[in-house]
Amino acid sequence: MKRKLTAKEYTYVASMLFGLFFGAGNLIFPVHLGQMAGSNVWQAILGLLITGVGLPLLGVAALGISRSNGLFDLSSKVNRPYAMFFTCALYLTIGPFFAIPRCATTSFTVGLEQVLPQNGSNTLYLLLFSVLFFAAALFFALRPGKILTWVGKILNPCFLVFLAILVVVALLSPSAAIADVEPLGDYASQPFFAGFLEGYNTMDALASLAFGIIVVQVIRDLGVDDPAAVAGSTVRAGIFSSLLMAFIYIAVTIAGTQSRGVLEASENGGTALAQIAQHYLGSAGLFILAATVTLACLKTAVGLITSCAETFSALFPDGPKYRIWAIIFSLVSLLFANLGLSAIISYSLPVLMFLYPLSIALIALALLGKFFGHDRTVYCWTIGFTLIAAVYDLIIALPESVFNAIHGPAIKAFGQQYLPFADLGLGWICPTLIGTAIGLILHFMRENRAKA
């Protein structure tokens, strides 16, 4: 049994981790954060890096150290019904409800929308674009082959090179000093926590639970079998990819902040990224950005459709087969994509506010499980209390019309009175700790009785 990877193997796993979590769509969030955070950008970046870089790495390590065979297996430590619910909810979120549609709308917003006349026909153009986009995505998802691998190997380096050129030019020719840019919205009063919650939008912590088993299995296939060694190898290999991802996020965020000297804060990061590219590199730069982002998002969409279809065909063996699931998810994604990028980001927020506390709690339990033998009692009490608080966070983040219809103001007032950190969007922390404490007390009481 091998205890550690070679330098070459670390590089291989690191590149896989980077490819797993970094996508062109992720860039729209740091650039938007930069425009909004203004002079408070460094506190906001710190929050973003915790949820956008640190948590995904811990999610993969959690799968390794807990010896789980994937998300369903890990969440089954609570119970099987919860595992079915959580697995379906998470895959639908990083799949046809939000992440896959976002691939199409990001491509449209960064590219075609920037050259269209503002005459109210964008809805029709988005429909036509998304039909073509998902027709291509479904075509490749139903015909897996080496072409997408080849496109990825060629495209990712090209995209990173172009991004590097854009960011370097933007940073070397700032249109405003960071200290002079006024922070907007929540970034003016609580930049760290606003950045922390912005990291939810990357969905990478959710993706780490869904796809992290791929990386863990690769490490195991390379001969590392001990759970602690697998987790250690994952973390060490992930340091390089995490540092690279963090560097890219920081650079793009700063470019977004400095763009406020010539650009107004955009409605979403896709528009901001396109405007920055056009400002610094002209129409040619905008075209190159649009082409690379579109192809990169297409590749991501194909991967997500494939993964979701495979997962649901495995979860429901007596239900539709892979091909039918792929078609269903493509059609659902097409429907949601036509809401537009800003609407998708807005509607995804309540779901992310619900899923992220549950995911963070599950990751923490998996990482620390050796101290309580992965006792189901601890898992149940922790997730149970977290679930209650997560429902509260979901309600608070609902659109205003729905929020008011379900007596949201009264629920919000109650939570802010009795839930510490609720006003920061982190009201789940104390309930999670309380649930964990109860679970641990019951675990050790039962353990002591067994020894007596």
Q: Where are the model-predicted features located?
A:
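Hydrophobic alpha-helical segments and their helix-loop junctions in multi-pass secondary transporters
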Residues: P96, I100, L160-Y187, A205-L206, ...
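Hydrophobic, membrane-embedded alpha-helices of multi-pass small-molecule transporters
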Residues: T11-F22, L92, V169-A176, G185-V252, ...
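TM-loop-TM module centered on a large, flexible mid-protein loop between adjacent transmembrane helices
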Residues: G70-S76, I248-L298, I305, A314, ...
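A generic transmembrane alpha-helix motif of multi-pass inner-membrane proteins
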Residues: S173, L184, D375-A452
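Membrane-interface loop-to-helix entry segments
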Residues: A141-A170, L349-I360, Y379-A389
